[in-house]
Amino acid sequence: MSNPPTRPTLYNLVNADGELSYRARDLVQDFSVPIPHELPDPDLVHSIQDFATEYMLATGKKSFECLDESALLGLGYLVTEWMDAMVTDCLEEFEER
């Protein structure tokens, strides 16, 4: 197993005493899931995690369980694909001019 991230996040601090605290996992080893391409950037995943935690704290929601690793990876893939599509559209529009 990988070591936990060294960067403290708000989610880690909130869940420091619970069993849901973040642990870095090797998805291939733990779940035998083939990874088709590179994982999302760790800084992007941390940013999504921090934003979601701050949003839940601000709105009074207590569902920190929804911030598990697979949800964060899924959101990371989604944001990465969305950004790639935006850049591609901008480049195509620029080439047309």
Curated annotation (Swiss-Prot):
GO annotations of cellular component type: cytosol; nucleus; RNA polymerase I upstream activating factor complex
Alphabetic keyword roster: Cytoplasm, Nucleus, Transcription, Transcription regulation
Pfam families on file: UAF_Rrn10
InterPro entries cross-referenced by the UniProt entry: Rrn10
Chief localization: cytoplasm
GO BP terms, alphabetized: transcription initiation at RNA polymerase I promoter
Location relative to the cell: Cytoplasm; Nucleus, Nucleolus
Signal peptide coordinates: none
Role this protein plays: Component of the UAF (upstream activation factor) complex which interacts with the upstream element of the RNA polymerase I promoter and forms a stable preinitiation complex. UAF seems to stimulate basal transcription to a fully activated level.
Subunit annotation: Component of the UAF (upstream activation factor) complex which consists of spp27/uaf30, rrn5, rrn10, and histones H3 and H4. Interacts with rrn5 and spp27/uaf30.
The name this protein goes by in its record: RNA polymerase I-specific transcription initiation factor rrn10
Organism: Schizosaccharomyces pombe (strain 972 / ATCC 24843)
Taxonomic lineage of the native organism: Eukaryota, Fungi, Dikarya, Ascomycota, Taphrinomycotina
